[in-house]
Amino acid sequence: MIYAYIRVSTDKQTVENQRFEINRFAKQRDFQIDVWVEETVSGTRSAKDRKLGVLLKRIKKGDTLIVSEISRLGRRLMEVMSILNACMLKNVILLTVKEKYELGNNIQSQILAFAFSLSAQIE
């Protein structure tokens, strides 16, 4: 299954830009998104208190999760690292549109995931 996750922080923001970017990204790679998960919630809220938490329980080995950028997963470093770790442990591939990275269950992915989540926190 290929999942796309979209998060905006306020009602004043729209999901359309992220949806467009993810659709374009998927089309370039000849992917078909099976499930879209969208929510309007602060990235500082715990993943378990968001639709993302349900999605993380649902995904399984071989699935792919696409986000527009790593900061859509969360704003706190430890939260993002926990989400990335959960994906890696399940052998789920995480693709980021903005950064153009493929994060899997390998050491290079773990290093990149740490660096990106740190930069998202600094922003």
Which residues make up each language-model segment?
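Short, structured surface patches at the beginning of a domain
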Residues: M1-E123
